């Protein structure tokens, strides 16, 4: 029998035991994606990197089209390739920085060309550094995101507030923030929290979906556009045909302007 998506199969079998399941995965794309993951796993193994994962999703519906939870080529079982790292919490690194940027743009706390400080910083013994150990003095906010600078983002988080940022992340679909804001502190923006590829892919897909529909809805928003990915064929909902549809609102978690500026920097 075909075994093209073993990690997804194991996940769904555990979540829905004994059920007959139809997924949204496309077999040809699944095989291509898994082959790509396996190829890079072999290439990176010389650097002791043995675990990789990838998701391909339809932004419009959130349907998962390919789900490669880990490398599947024959390998030492001690490397953990049987573990589905799509759903396994990992350090978020710098991947939350665009959400902070968008949140500050939305709230009027920042403009793309506003200068932010990149000088040595110490917060109760926590001294962040940029990846290249260099400080740039003052940089435009959009440059701080493009270069993924650490020090300016820590300053931005201090201004925005950690608890407020956690609420924003949760509202976009992050489910792994289980501790208090005091627990994470300023390190939240530099990987101090764990996230899953599943959540984060859904969050970025939602950002793209909201922005894509902004013109369609003539400057209004549909809260239902913010939702997680699904491994099943998406429910086909009645399309919105009128700008007075009760499902639309003028309020947004993040405005289209904030989303446009943010996504244009990371080329989504």
Predicted region positions:
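A penicillin-recognizing enzyme superfamily signal
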Residues: 23-43, 56-58, 67, 75-85, ...
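Short alpha-helical patches at coil-to-helix transitions and adjacent helical residues
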Residues: 30, 93-98, 138, 146, ...
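Residue-level preference for non-acidic, small/hydrophobic
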Residues: 33, 62, 95-104, 144, ...
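Active-site catalytic microenvironments for nucleophilic, acid-base chemistry
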Residues: 39, 103-108, 159, 206-210
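Conserved catalytic neighborhood of penicillin-recognizing serine enzymes
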Residues: 2-13, 60, 110-165, 209, ...
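Active-site-adjacent helix/loop patches that line small-molecule binding or acyl-intermediate pockets
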Residues: 21, 25, 49-54, 116-121, ...
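Hydrophobic alpha-helix feature that most strongly marks membrane-spanning transmembrane helices
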Residues: 69, 100, 104-105, 170, ...
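Periplasmic/cell-envelope proteins involved in peptidoglycan metabolism and beta-lactam response
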Residues: 1-3, 7, 14-90, 94-95, ...
């Amino acid at each position: 029998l075909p075994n093209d998506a073993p990690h997804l199969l194991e996940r769904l079998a555990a979540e829905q035991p004994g059920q007959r399941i139809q997924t949204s995965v496309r077999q040809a794309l699944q095989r291509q994606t898994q082959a790509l993951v396996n190829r890079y796993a072999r290439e990176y193994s010389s650097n002791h990197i043995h675990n990789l994962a990838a998701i391909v999703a339809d932004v419009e519906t959130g349907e998962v089209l390919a789900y490669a939870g880990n490398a599947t080529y024959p390998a030492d079982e001690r490397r953990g390739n049987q573990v589905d790292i799509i759903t396994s919490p990992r350090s978020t690194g710098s991947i939350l920085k665009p959400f902070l940027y968008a949140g500050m743009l939305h709230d009027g706390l920042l403009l793309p060309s506003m200068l932010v400080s990149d000088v040595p910083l110490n917060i109760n013994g926590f001294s962040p550094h940029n990846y290249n150990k260099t400080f740039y003095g003052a940089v435009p906010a959009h440059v701080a995101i493009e270069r993924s600078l650490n020090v300016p983002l820590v300053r931005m988080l201090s201004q925005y507030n950690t608890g407020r940022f956690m609420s924003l992340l949760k509202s976009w679909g992050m489910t792994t923030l289980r501790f208090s804001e005091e627990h994470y502190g300023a390190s939240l923006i530099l990987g101090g929290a764990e996230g899953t590829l599943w959540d984060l892919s859904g969050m970025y897909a939602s950002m793209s979906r909201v922005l894509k529909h902004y013109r369609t809805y003539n400057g209004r928003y549909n809260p239902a556009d913010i939702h997680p990915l699904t491994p099943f064929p998406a429910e086909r909902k009645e399309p919105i045909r009128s700008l007075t549809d009760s499902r639309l609102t003028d309020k947004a978690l993040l405005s289209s302007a904030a989303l446009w500026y943010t996504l244009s920097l990371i080329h989504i």
